[in-house]
Curated annotation (Swiss-Prot):
PANTHER family: 2,3-BISPHOSPHOGLYCERATE-INDEPENDENT PHOSPHOGLYCERATE MUTASE. The gene is gpmI. Its cofactor is Mn(2+). Mn(2+) 2 binds at residues 13, 63, 430-431. Keywords: Glycolysis, Isomerase, Manganese, Metal-binding. The active site is at residue 63. Its EC number is 5.4.2.12. Belongs to the BPG-independent phosphoglycerate mutase family. Binds 2 manganese ions per subunit. GO terms for cellular component: cytosol. It comes from the Bacteria. This is 2,3-bisphosphoglycerate-independent phosphoglycerate mutase. Mn(2+) 1 binds at residues 389, 393, 448. It catalyses: (2R)-2-phosphoglycerate = (2R)-3-phosphoglycerate.
Amino acid sequence: MSLNKKLALIIIDGLGIGKKDDTNAVYLANPKTLNYLIKNYPTLEISAAQQPIGLLENQAGNSEIGHLTIGAGRIILNDNANINSYTKRLDYESLVLNDINNEIVHVVGMYSNGLVHSNYEHIHWIIKELVKNNNQVVLHLISDGRDDYPYGFAQFIEQINALKTQYNVIIKSLSGRYFAMDRDQRWERTQKAFNTMFIKQDKICEQSLLEVAQSIANHYESDEFVEPIVFNNDEKYNLKPYQKVILTNYRSDRMRQLAHLLKPNRKFNYHNPFLIKDIHLITLVPFPDVDAITLFEKQNLNNTLGDVLNDHHIKQARVAETEKYGHISFFFDGGINKHYASKTQYLIPSQKVATYDLCPQMSASLITKTIIDHYFDHDVFIVNYANPDMVGHSGNMKQTIQAILSVDSEIQKLYDFFKKNNGVLMITGDHGNAETMIDANGQIITSHSINDVWFIITDNNIVFDQTQKFSLANIAPTILEYLNIKKPIEMAASSMIKKIHK
């Protein structure tokens, strides 16, 4: 099937709708192209957080659930909610954990209530289950500072110390997520975290966990950047062959590199010089390309937007830079690596900088160039521009403004090119971030927001339904109606289109 009009779904990561004041980098940037499109084309404000996309009240959206929901065309049970449906049951017992007896078990996870990559309550649950069978838990903590308050880790120390006392947990190490959860193949970061966690170190931290947490603000920009440190250097708590390691983060994209260092997989070519063989790796949910035992199964999503386009032989292109590549492929396709005959994926390398506020333009221009260069090769483009989110996470207002302006400039190029060639853009965000940079107390915010996002279509023949509130789940049905394709029954959400003028 060949389309009369080329269509591009442009997902501007972290671009939400906020207050028109100096806490909002989007407002301060005053992006002329986006402003023009919002004013001159059909536009809706749609939900990208909380219950409308299957999250909890006051829970911010994130890139994983955002792309998952956009691609699925329905509200889905996210990993956190799915896991909670088991762990909150008093009668639930894990067969995997019940089979672990009288062992030293390493537990690794981000202790955070950001609920983007992890939930600290899952760490509690796993520890409680393990100690029932006389296991010794060795805990490796990862601090957040990105999906939570910049220095929010200190608030958890009392809880963590209670775990230590009540369950005789060994607090072995602490690492900022910058190191332990890199996803851009900066292997020196992941290796540093691995070595600190599992390999004997010459230097041990003399401070208590509380003292370290209280001093983070004096040494680091946020909890995210805490250098990996060891609290216990006892040889018997270093990782050894045949021992078990449980990764408690449920989101895979920022755990796969650490998983690779524990148990090499075909995804990466990097070799761990300190590889410990025959490790038994356990994850909460299945991770792509990772050989691990899983505690919980993922929800199986069929008939996603990618499936339907492929079934109709519509040539689709996925374009993003490294930081968000997994989102427009793995997550967009329902949390599965699907290889469609009709799909071409373009991976644009992210800039090799320590943090993206040092390069707010990121690789946006190469994304645009790739789309334009391959315009006539495909029918539908699924695109992610990462700048507002990745730079917004730095908390640097000035550079976040530059990030937004960089993307705005690229949108102008795409708009001009698509208009000239009778193509159409659909523009949205996957969640908010850059529009809420400072809180009511004047503190920097580096985390996502619960704000709405725009949905714009550059076709004035479209009339949107203004009588109800829509969400990210309505995007796929809208695309299918625009393409005159019947949506599958699994897509429970409706189209946002009221009428198409011929």
